[in-house]
Amino acid sequence: MAKSHQSVTMVELFYDLIFAYAVGRMAQTLAVPVHGMIAPQVLVEFLLMLLVFWTIWTFQTVLIDRFSHHEVTHNLFTLFNMFWVIVLSTAINPDFAKTKWPFQLSAAILFLSLASQYGLLWRRKHSQLAKTFGITLAACSFVILISLFIKPYTLSFAVFFGGVLAAGLMPLLLRNVLKATPADLGNLSTRYSLLVLLIFGESIIGVAETIYAGLSLQAGLFFLVVILLFIAYQLVYDNGLDRRQKTAGLAVIYLQLP
């Protein structure tokens, strides 16, 4: 009998909505045009910040997908993480030096929270995946906390993003461990598609705000690009994935990032 897919809970949908809001707010805060152009430095900063949010969200989603952790404890952790995601998003400032303490401290707390969830699962289920991810996330949280006390500021941020990048790439190095606990591709792809859909919605809202201020060719073209990207994504989602496979799910995880 084929394994039935997990259903997405209301708490998870709420969590995804908060993340979509955070990504949208981050884009609005950092994408401040200078002479009608977005500076390359701002684009790099946006991508680095996006990596932080994506890594946190991915580890939470992998935990739910692998272990079907729909319990009171999991819901409490999720609600706790929601609060810190909001703090993380409101801490973003175009002047990164002012962002350092609230942003990096919030990220450290979130990684430590995720490490605790994986640690509890390891104690209960003795899963090698839960143990490895728990240690990885705890180490990342420690590196982020250390980065808070490093000077100058540029070196502090380099250490911070180095820790986040190492955590984000860790699943690629643990392919065999992930295969030992196969992904529920139906659930995993649904979660990612819902988040992408919410982010597309945030983009449309951003266009609507500019249209309200006055119609422009630029706003119309941006709206068209968003719609075309959405259609392309839907075609790939509907036709490019065999959800019956038992895989590590790495393709679903990493191909969603671009």
Report the location of each language-model feature:
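Predominantly late transmembrane helices and immediately cytosolic-facing juxtamembrane segments
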Residues: 3-9, 17-18, 47-61, 67, ...
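A structural signal for hydrophobic alpha-helical transmembrane segments in multi-pass membrane proteins
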Residues: 10, 14-35
